[in-house]
């Protein structure tokens, strides 16, 4: 069973590391091509392209300019400990044991606009480049065209190494569009999280994002290997809702948040 999630805009390169173990991203040559395009952009062009404030555009222009290989523990940080958005609040990798990190390294991947696909312990340098960004590049007008089949090929390699054919999609629509479903050698299970509000179950973005992280944490900490075991997920009051689930779209609901 392979899990995929989105990255986060918010980063944390300051807090103490929960592990000293690390690995290297597998697609850095591709990342370098994107960096070569990004460093040509002025802060104002970055602000327009990424819809950022002048301050954030300046910060990210500096990040692109400072990006350099090789990655070391002095100039980079493990991906799973670098992202700090709602999904990662639910995941809470800072509290992982060595066994949790080991399981995650095999069974958990992070989709990325710049790095393509990251293992949890892959070192990364700070960046902002969302998958939906319309960055012109040598392969097209956006990052979906740039990555093409590359991300899917990497996922297929990982699935083959796991000798498994199930992928749990905990990523956003924007990021999962980078995966070519027809080329993926896996059944895709997509969990959805809904909260009771105004007399009906609804997807509430903040809660749904955190729940994706909670589910990843549940799978990792319990070392789940069978997809049916996911239906036992019960963190934060969520429960599998068989009546609302259909085929490979699994719905988890809760009445109180």
Curated annotation (Swiss-Prot):
One of its GO terms (biological process) is response to hydroperoxide. One of its GO terms (cellular component) is cytosol. InterPro entries: YaaA. It holds the Pfam family H2O2_YaaD. It comes from the Bacteria. HAMAP family: UPF0246. Belongs to the UPF0246 family. This is UPF0246 protein CPS_4102. It comes from Colwellia psychrerythraea (strain 34H / ATCC BAA-681).
């Amino acid at each position: 069973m392979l899990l995929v999630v989105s990255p986060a805009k918010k980063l944390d390169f300051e807090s103490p590391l929960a592990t000293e173990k690390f690995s290297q991203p597998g697609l850095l040559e591709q990342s370098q091509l994107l960096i070569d395009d990004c460093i040509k952009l002025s802060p104002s062009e970055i602000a327009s392209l990424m819809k950022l404030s002048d301050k954030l555009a300046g910060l990210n222009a500096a990040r692109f300019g400072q990006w350099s290989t090789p990655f070391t523990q002095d100039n980079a940080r493990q991906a799973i400990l670098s992202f700090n958005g709602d999904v990662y609040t639910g995941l809470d990798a800072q509290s992982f044991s060595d066994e949790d990190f080991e399981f995650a390294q095999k069974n958990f991947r992070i989709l990325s606009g710049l790095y393509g696909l990251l293992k949890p312990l892959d070192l990364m340098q700070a960046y902002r480049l969302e998958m939906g960004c319309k960055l012109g590049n040598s392969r097209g007008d956006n990052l979906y065209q740039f990555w093409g089949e590359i991300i899917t090929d990497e996922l297929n390699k990982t699935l083959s190494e796991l000798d498994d054919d199930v992928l749990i999609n905990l990523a956003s629509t924007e990021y999962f569009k980078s995966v070519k479903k027809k080329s993926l050698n896996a059944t895709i299970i997509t969990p959805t999280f809904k909260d009771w509000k105004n007399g009906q179950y609804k997807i509430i973005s903040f809660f749904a994002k955190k729940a994706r992280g909670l589910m990843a944490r549940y799978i990792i900490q319990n070392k789940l290997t069978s997809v049916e075991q996911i239906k036992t997920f019960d963190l934060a009051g969520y429960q599998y809702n068989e009546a609302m689930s259909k085929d490979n779209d699994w719905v988890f609901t809760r009445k109180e948040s």
